[in-house]
């Protein structure tokens, strides 16, 4: 007898376009960036940081998360398939023949590495404190992660082992007949809680806290959750290991988070958005551009 469970058979395509369409997964990715931009823009405005820095940061983050998450999935979880002469183009090609299918494999570990590398490049160019940015950026990344994981649930993918718990999902679209742990839903709920606590702390401190403190504990919380949920997952098994691949990948981030939190508590990380001062050349360039746009609008309104 099948225990009480949720029968899940949702269409993975949220918006149909011809033979294909926009999947829930891709929609979640877009919502994550839209809401993330809105929230971080308010943080920058609240702390009197030039909005031009955010416009540049958005491009860096979009490319870092997309490329990092996609490469992370292909390298860590499906290397044997993608890195072959027949399938390597599929790494970044979102079409199956003439049908748009989007990207059906993104890894949070790869996204995290991509973000860190992109911020290093951003810091080199814009002279902005990467630790300060990370404290604010990870708040919205947790929200984005929740949307993406909900997209996984709607796509009937990344679920766990069999369960007799009443909230087990029978993923009928995949031909499943036994309830499974909805691990994507577990992660989405956990990420929403991490987002709520991080945002609450940021607002409570009014943005005035030791640099690196949110980022450090965020790493511990998010990848700690990933480590625990992996116990009821099935993909990523390593022969001869009691831990799954996702757990081994999470451990360095947890340890790194603890180290960063310790340095932050001791005040050993650079404080403020511009500890060495702003890039005066860029600031002057943006000011001239803003003045030019302002004059154009004035002339247009006077006509």
What is each model feature region?
Residues 1-303:
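Hydrophobic, membrane-interfacing alpha helices
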